[in-house]
Amino acid sequence: MMQYAIFARPVVTIYDLPQTTKQSEAGLVSTIGDEGLYGQACQVRTAPGGVTAEGVPLSPEVAEVVTFYGYHGFVRRDALKFVSEDALRDYLPRPLVLVGRATDVLSLPKVQGVRMLELERGCLLCRLPEPPEEALAHTGWAKVALLDGRTGYVREVALEPVRFEMTAVFSQREGLAFDDALAKARNITAGELVPQALQAWYHGSEEAFRDAVCAQAKKYLGTEYRWGGKSGRGIDCSGLVSSAYMQCGVLIYRDARIVEGWPVHQIPFADKKRGDALYFPGHIALYLGEGRYIHSTGASASGGVVINSLDPADPLYREDLVKSLYAVGSVF
């Protein structure tokens, strides 16, 4: 029987291997591949201490997981809250998403409250109902439930509706394309995924969606580059682009390439529009229009989320990237 879990730390490291490091030509390096955020769901493919389908034994402290957006990896047991399918199905419609770069969960609905947890943009919290008189007494604050059973408070302005779907966590299987898994969970066709997201959140407007994706990406400007990162603490190139799309309701492939079975497909360079993805060898950026793009770069000169340009006349021009640009991807 399939098992499930919820990420129970503000930022959860997802490793590409059951061990946290590996030897490379450069020396010992991390095996980090991604990060899960508090409140997000995953499928547990192999329980801690079990043996994977490939015959790899896991330590009692490590689980093999697949995130709701299709990323496969390994997570420490103590970073997960294991739940039944019924419990997860009950949970998924409830959370709201945090939209600030960092949000404190406080013990009281006032700034002097004890800080219980510090969460990142993209983390999820469930708001608790309150009697009208209690809610009126602390207008501007929302009472929320933490995964460990405690309750706390955050500012109402920090919470927004979740635009992305996590239901693919139930239908993902080996050999099934991600779009097909999500479509199956929602009882629609894969071709309806993007149009339905636009209809639900942007009145069907492609232009509004493109604007929203670019605005989301710009919220990370100045964030440090972190290999495998996907939060305001540090983010990598594909973490930036996939997070911008996710927060706008469309789940794309997590890494820096176009993969069949996901919404992004290649289009001619001349057809690129703001919100499309630019692909370089091992790198991805988000096109902002007028020749400029935003990306998270590990280059020593910047080392984080910056804006650069495809235009040689622009002071933000990066010749090295322009020369290696090999594809433009779009969900339209």
What feature does the model see in each segment?
Residues 30, 36, 119, 271-273, ...:
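Short, well-ordered loop/turn sites that connect or cap secondary structure elements
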Residues 313-332:
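Low-complexity, Gly/Ser/Thr/Pro-rich intrinsically disordered linker/tail segments
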Residues 22-31, 104-115, 260-269:
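Short alpha-helix capping/helix-loop boundary micro-motifs
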Residues 250-311:
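...with weaker cross-activation on analogous glycine-rich loops/strands in unrelated enzymes
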Residues 213, 217, 228-248:
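Active-site nucleophilic cysteine motif
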Residues 93-131:
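Asp-box/WD-like beta-propeller blade repeats and closely related beta-sheet repeat scaffolds
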Residues 1-12, 19-27, 38-97, 110, ...:
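Boundary regions of SH3-family modules and the immediately adjacent low-complexity/disordered segments
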Residues 39, 119-128, 191, 274-275:
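Loop/turn positions that initiate beta-strands
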